[in-house]
């Protein structure tokens, strides 16, 4: 595979999943990790991604970077507007992080009066712009890559919460394997969020469906509702409906 083709693949993967590991790319591309690191360094110098230890992050995922080029933004807006229909006045709502969650928060009706609990720094900052909702940030140790609070204290606080809904930003979701991700600390927090909620809603662009990462967040049966940009009767979603998941 030519360098141009490798780098195009890397950009595609980072756009879909927001973050990539050098070791995974090495396996997928059948090249050495040194080659992958050189590609990531070059793409970083071109301003196309953020190189971090062990991999890279999407620039649109990193809220400190001023970048309006969010991948598949129209599709994420569709997902956000579908999700808003589930939120009612008086609800306690858990929010993870990610660009789709941020679009959800940006689209909240100004008159909505709900309590939002989040572990995500960008999500909390976006919620500050909402006039009528209470914000609870569960802070502790921060994951620089995910820009969210992680650790035993956060998990313990989540264990004491009984929320109506949990909106989960999704890295990968396969109808057989479930929701998967890359970072252990982040996964432990997401598991606690799912346990803390009466219903869990996965927000996912369709490109993240039928993909699998290294670490399990939850089995498919633990997701109550899946929201994508697709029409609910799209055949791509049939496998998820077969698992008893409500598809919006």
What does each model-found stretch correspond to?
Residues 2-5, 12, 22-23, 125-248:
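Conserved phosphate- and dinucleotide-binding cores of soluble alpha/beta proteins
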Residues 28-29, 167:
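Aromatic-residue hotspot detector
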Residues 45, 74-75, 118-119, 148-149, ...:
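Short, intrinsically disordered/low-complexity patches at protein termini
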């Amino acid at each position: 595979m030519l360098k141009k083709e490798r780098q195009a693949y890397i950009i595609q993967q980072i756009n879909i999943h927001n973050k990539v590991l050098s070791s995974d790319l090495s396996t997928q591309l059948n090249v050495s990790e040194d080659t992958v690191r050189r590609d990531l360094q070059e793409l970083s110098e071109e301003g196309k991604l953020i190189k971090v230890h062990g991999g890279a992050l999407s620039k649109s995922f990193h809220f400190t970077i001023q970048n309006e080029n969010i991948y598949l933004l129209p599709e994420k807006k569709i997902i956000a507007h579908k999700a808003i229909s589930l939120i009612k006045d008086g609800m306690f709502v858990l929010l993870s992080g990610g660009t789709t969650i941020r679009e959800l928060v940006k689209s909240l009706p100004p008159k909505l009066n709900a309590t939002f609990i989040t572990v995500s720094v960008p999500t909390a900052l976006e919620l500050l712009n909402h006039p009528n909702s209470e914000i609870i940030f569960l802070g502790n140790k921060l994951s620089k890559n995910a820009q969210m609070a992680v650790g035993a204290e956060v998990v313990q606080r989540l264990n004491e919460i009984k929320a109506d809904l949990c909106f989960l930003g999704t890295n990968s979701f396969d109808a057989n394997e479930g929701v998967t991700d890359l970072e252990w600390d982040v996964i432990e927090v997401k598991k606690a969020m799912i346990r803390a909620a009466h219903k869990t809603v996965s927000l996912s662009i369709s490109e993240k469906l039928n993909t699998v990462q290294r670490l399990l967040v939850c089995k498919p049966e633990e997701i109550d509702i899946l929201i994508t940009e697709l029409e609910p009767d799209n055949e791509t979603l049939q496998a998820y409906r077969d698992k008893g998941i409500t598809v919006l």
